[in-house]
From Swiss-Prot:
Pfam families from the UniProt entry: YgbB
Listed name of the protein: 2-C-methyl-D-erythritol 2,4-cyclodiphosphate synthase
Stored CDD domains: MECDP_synthase
Subunit structure: Homotrimer.
Cofactor: a divalent metal cation
Site (Transition state stabilizer): H34, T133
Binding residues annotated for 4-CDP-2-C-methyl-D-erythritol 2-phosphate, in chain numbering: 8-10, 34-35, 56-58, 61-65, 100-106, 132-135, 139, 142
Name of the gene this protein is made from: ispF
Swiss-Prot/TrEMBL GO biological process terms: isopentenyl diphosphate biosynthetic process, methylerythritol 4-phosphate pathway; terpenoid biosynthetic process
HAMAP family: IspF
Database matches in SUPFAM superfamilies: IpsF-like
Length: 158
């Protein structure tokens, strides 16, 4: 078994859309990023790549490459997962924590889990997404952006 950890932060800005966990969330701003800014999927991708010792999302999909400008983070996650599975791993579980004062995430979490499980070809019970605030402290508490952490467990299949 192998464990990986992911962390990402994006600042609010622009008109959107705001996409988290592959879900469009109604909010007046999006997240500033080279790709679509999906902080949850970026974090999940980093945790999975780390567990497989395949580097990180920036190594695989550099923000200096115009091919990834505005990229769909679900497509990036699927490509990372293809490489991980090719190394002989399956998902044990993935646990994601969104850290944001706004917007509220609870209503969107079930669909996030469905999207991620679909992209990883696993059961929804293998994917957990939760959200918390920082009680109005720091940049997330001031509503300036969103942070996210994830932990992934991979199990060798071959």
């Amino acid at each position: 078994m192998r464990i990986g950890h992911g962390f990402d932060v994006h600042k609010f800005g622009g008109e959107g859309p705001l996409i988290i966990g592959g879900v469009r969330i109604p909010y007046p701003q999006g997240l500033l990023a080279h790709s679509d800014g999906d902080v949850a999927l970026h974090t999940a991708t980093d945790a999975l790549l780390g567990a497989a010792a395949l580097g990180d999302i920036g190594k695989l999909f550099p923000d200096t490459d115009s091919a990834f400008k505005g990229a769909d983070s679900r497509a990036l996650l699927r490509e990372a997962w293809r490489r991980i599975a090719a190394k002989g791993y399956r998902l044990g579980n993935l646990d994601i924590t969104l850290i944001a004062q706004v917007p509220k995430m609870a209503l969107h979490i079930p669909q996030m889990r469905v999207n991620i499980a679909e992209d990883l070809g696993c059961h929804m019970d293998d994917v957990n997404v939760k959200a918390t605030t920082t009680e109005q402290l720091g940049f997330t508490g001031r509503g300036e952006g969103i942070a996210c952490e994830a932990v992934a467990l991979l199990v060798r299949t071959s």
